[in-house]
């Protein structure tokens, strides 16, 4: 499965770790869309501090987006990927809106003779949907998390990286450097550009398992974490056949940029392309991190093998 690093924590104790390929104990590894879930934890910390309200409109914080698809959307819509837009998350796109997005974020080079005005200018141009309304669809769209990152920088009056370090990494006891990719103008790609060490991501997962607490202090409000785990109506989620999530977790849901699996142990997880996983099983008191370098963005066969592996590990430790 092209695994670079793998670790298991059970009841707060590291019981297994393994490295190969690009993995090393002291080397940050890109976590791709797990970055989204990390951003949601930071958003929760800011909600707890009273600087962010998830029911406020996106444009209350970012009036720059008033002409975009984000007009009329709330922060909660961002968090649950229930924004109606004309964006398509298509990794095969070589010259359309998804490629324009990647170029704006400085993840792909600008074509010869071309130019980009950066990620945030791209977000101001996000096309509206002609067929749906906010809150009526689950539409996995990476740029929505970049908007959340912009909101976080606006309300915190500091960079996303500094705030994540101050409010999440340090309180969890992280011991290695982390970083996040930036566009040409310094905007972070909060949708997928974070790189963290294996053990530090494991500690964040353990904080989530412990309802937001780490090292004797509240890092993220317990109410925020409980809401991520809470079972709720999932008809919007089940009505979609785009993205991979609904196919893996038919009875699951998506809350605050985390996947609810709908499995018997009420596991939640964060997933990144090319094989990144953060798996939390509250019933088995289990946290698992897998970092990898899959050849393809999404590999359903390997994903299902990993789900079976996570279940087997939980059964073996219970």
Outline where the language-model segments fall:
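Active-site helix/loop module of the DD-peptidase/beta-lactamase fold
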Residues: 30, 48-90, 155-192, 196
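Active-site Gly/Thr loop motif
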Residues: 175-179, 226-287
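Active-site SXXK
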Residues: 12, 30-54, 78, 148-152, ...
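Catalytic-site signature segments of enzymes, centered on catalytic residues
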Residues: 25-26, 90-93, 101-185, 189-192
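A short, well-structured edge-of-sheet supersecondary motif
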Residues: 1-23, 285-289
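Structured C-terminal helix/loop/strand segments within mature extracytoplasmic catalytic/sensor domains
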Residues: 267-318
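Active-site-proximal alpha-helical segments within enzyme catalytic domains
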Residues: 81, 144-151, 192-213, 276-292
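Short, small/polar residue-rich loop motifs at catalytic or cofactor-binding pockets
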Residues: 1-3, 27, 273-274
């Amino acid at each position: 499965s092209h695994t670079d690093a793998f670790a298991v924590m059970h009841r707060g104790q590291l019981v297994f770790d393994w490295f190969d390929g690009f993995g090393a104990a002291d080397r940050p590894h890109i976590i791709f869309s797990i970055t989204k879930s990390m951003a949601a934890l930071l958003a929760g910390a800011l909600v707890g501090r009273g600087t962010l309200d998830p029911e406020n409109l996106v444009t209350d914080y970012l009036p720059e987006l008033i002409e975009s698809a984000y007009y009329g959307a709330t922060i909660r819509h961002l968090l649950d990927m229930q924004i109606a837009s004309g964006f398509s998350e298509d990794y095969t796109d070589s010259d359309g809106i998804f490629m324009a997005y990647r170029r704006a974020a400085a993840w792909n080079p600008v074509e010869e003779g071309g130019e980009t005005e950066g990620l945030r200018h791209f977000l101001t141009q996000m096309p509206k949907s002609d067929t749906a309304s906010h809150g009526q669809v689950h539409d996995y769209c990476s740029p929505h998390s970049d908007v959340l990152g912009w909101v976080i920088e606006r309300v915190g009056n500091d960079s996303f990286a500094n705030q994540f370090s101050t409010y999440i990494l340090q309180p969890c006891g992280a011991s290695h450097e982390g970083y996040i990719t930036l566009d040409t103008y310094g905007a972070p790609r909060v949708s997928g550009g974070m790189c963290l060490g294996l053990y530090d991501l494991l500690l964040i997962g353990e904080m989530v398992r412990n309802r937001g607490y780490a090292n004797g202090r509240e890092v993220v409000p317990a109410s925020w974490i409980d809401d991520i785990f809470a079972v709720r109506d999932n008809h919007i989620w089940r009505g979609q056949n785009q993205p991979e999530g609904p196919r893996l977790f038919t009875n699951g849901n998506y809350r605050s940029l985390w996947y609810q699996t709908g499995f018997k142990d009420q596991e939640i997880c964060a997933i990144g392309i090319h094989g990144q996983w953060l798996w939390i099983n509250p019933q088995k008191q289990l946290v698992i991190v897998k970092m990898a370098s899959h050849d393809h963005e999404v590999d359903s066969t390997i994903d299902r093998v990993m789900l079976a592996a996570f279940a087997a590990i939980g059964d073996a430790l219970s």
